[in-house]
Swiss-Prot record:
Its EC number is 1.15.1.1. Residues 1-20 form the signal peptide. Disulfide bonds join 75-170. The keyword Zinc applies. Homodimer. This is Superoxide dismutase [Cu-Zn]. It comes from Brucella melitensis biotype 1 (strain ATCC 23456 / CCUG 17765 / NCTC 10094 / 16M). Belongs to the Cu-Zn superoxide dismutase family. Destroys radicals which are normally produced within the cells and which are toxic to biological systems. It comes from the Bacteria. One of its GO terms (cellular component) is periplasmic space. It is an enzyme of class 1 (oxidoreductase).
Length: 174
């Protein structure tokens, strides 16, 4: 009897995998004065095949937008070449291997390169993208998420860092 109970209990536990860690990141407009209005959320969760980023955002222009994990846990503006740049305090793309290459989510460059987002005609994004090189949420805690104004070609040519342009929205990964 005891052996049957043990086997049954083990089977039940195996049927329900351990809950993976997840966190919700609030995304705010990146403005020269600092974070603006909330424009959506990104739920990051651990899953087989890499971290999953469930994006629900609005107020973007229709089309593709670069999406990255940035180095620092800040969305504050900063000064570059005498000009105030929104969310500059977030730093550059997360690149723990110091590759200095922007090769996309499948490449061997920045670990923070995520699949680009696609906003519909109403400027909304509701999709889940996977970062195959990022396995644990702990790898990116105390960093930031960034959505750029334009698309991303995952190359440093003809424009640096994929040509995504200005920083549109930013959120800190707690």
């Amino acid at each position: 009897m005891m052996k049957s109970l043990f086997i049954a209990s083990t089977m039940v536990l195996m049927a329900f995998p351990a809950f993976a860690e997840s966190t919700t990141v609030k995304m705010y407009e990146a403005l020269p004065t600092g974070p603006g209005k909330e424009v959506g959320t990104v739920v990051i969760s651990e899953a087989p095949g890499g971290l999953h980023f469930k994006v629900n955002m609005e107020k973007l222009t229709p089309g593709y937008h670069g999406f990255h994990v940035h180095e620092n846990p800040s969305c504050a503006p900063g000064e570059k070449d005498g000009k105030i740049v929104p969310a500059l305090a977030a730093g550059g793309h997360y690149d723990p291997g110091n590759t200095h290459h922007h090769l996309g989510p499948e490449g061997d460059g920045h670990m923070g390169d995520l699949p680009r987002l696609s906003a519909n005609a109403d400027g909304k994004v509701s999709e889940t993208v996977v970062a195959p090189h990022l396995k644990k949420l702990a790898e990116i805690k105390q960093r930031s998420l960034m959505v750029h104004v334009g698309g991303d070609n995952y190359s440093d040519k003809p424009e640096p860092l994929g040509g995504g342009g200005a920083r549109f929205a930013c959120g800190v990964i707690e």
